[in-house]
Amino acid sequence: THFVPQIISALERVKGKLNIPIVYNTGGYECVETLKMLEGYIDIYLPDFKYYDDEIALKYSAAGDYFEVVCAAIGEMFRQVGAAEFGGDGLMKKGIMIRHLTLPNHRHDSIAVLEEIASRWGTEDILLSLMSQYTPFYRSSEFPEISRRISTFEYNSVLKRAEELGFKGFMQEKSSAKEEYTPDFDLNGI
């Protein structure tokens, strides 16, 4: 994000006054140089890992280099914060939780994402948040293959592979894929 200098400035002002982990919630498509600026400021990274196949990334996100960029970014995040650590209260104190949202008709890409994460960083040190709440909005009608919610079969296929790979983390209930759980994104109140 282009706001990193302002984020660092704000964190400098509260350094030593906060007793909570600093969490960086990101879409994952980040420059390594930007992430290096955050070293020492962030305790927990929450990146998305959306696509394995760059053709899919190009089609839906106009990011034909998505896979290379996100892998480099998550690698840098892992270098900075290392393995997930929890306090005596059971809350995460540092580490990475990678989020992945399964898209309709793309379960094989989701499985490839999980296999890549397991291959590069293992399943012991990084947590996974496997999400099922995809709801077709915005321009999804331009892409018939994603203009519906994911099926139970699709999500369960990805969930099964996550379990086979040994991932720990949070596997979302498919029932969360309802409109009432999706923000309006209308910028009201901003």
Language-model features: locations:
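C-terminal accessory region of radical SAM enzymes
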Residues: 83-85, 90-94, 153-177
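Short amphipathic alpha-helical segment that frequently serves as the phosphate-/nucleotide-binding helix
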Residues: 111-114, 152, 156
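A hydrophobic, small-residue-rich beta->alpha segment in the mid-to-C-terminal subdomain
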Residues: 144-151
